[in-house]
């Protein structure tokens, strides 16, 4: 379960990556969730891109001054900056991330409930913060069906920005 600019959930069966008919299987970011009666892609709700967009919107409205200062100093917005501001206790950044991870947890639960894996590997800069890992576990397990909560192990791997490129 890989979260970056988008959300992917590559599927492996034994030691083989499962491929779809025309492309790779597991593009969970392109699946939809109903939010207040409106259908939205998981990428638009829980990806780093979604978090960036909400933070940028808040900065344009004059909020998140600490994040804006960091962004201007670095010349660009990065997930690491957002996480630093989150760890400093910024309520709005915490709310943005909490909501995004809530959607990611629902998406992950959908995958688990569909394929019933023995374990899931979660990888994201977002999960380098312990409370974000706990939030994902809470959101996912709260939507697991039956025994999945006890049976499915979610493993958080140390984040490596280039893991996707190395795997390709």
Where are these regions (language model features)?
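ATP-binding/phosphotransfer module of carbohydrate and carboxylate kinases, centering on a glycine-rich
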Residues: 35-168
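Phosphate-binding/catalytic loop of phosphoryl-transfer enzymes
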Residues: 1-41, 48-49, 167
């Amino acid at each position: 379960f890989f979260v970056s600019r988008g959300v992917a959930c590559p599927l492996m069966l034994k030691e083989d990556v499962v491929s779809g008919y025309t492309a790779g299987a597991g593009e969970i970011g392109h699946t939809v969730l109903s939010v207040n009666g409106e259908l939205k892609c998981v990428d638009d709700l829980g990806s780093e891109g979604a978090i960036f967009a909400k933070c940028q919107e808040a900065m344009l409205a004059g909020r998140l001054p600490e994040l804006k200062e960091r962004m201007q100093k670095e010349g660009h917005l990065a997930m690491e900056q957002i996480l630093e501001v989150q760890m400093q206790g910024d309520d709005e950044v915490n709310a943005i991330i909490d909501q995004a991870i809530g959607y990611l947890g629902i998406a992950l639960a959908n995958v688990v409930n569909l394929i019933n894996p023995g374990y899931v590997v979660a990888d994201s800069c977002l999960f380098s913060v312990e409370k974000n890992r706990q939030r994902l576990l809470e959101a996912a397990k709260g939507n697991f069906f039956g025994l999945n909560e006890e049976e499915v192990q979610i493993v958080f791997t140390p984040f490596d920005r280039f893991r996707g490129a190395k795997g390709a």
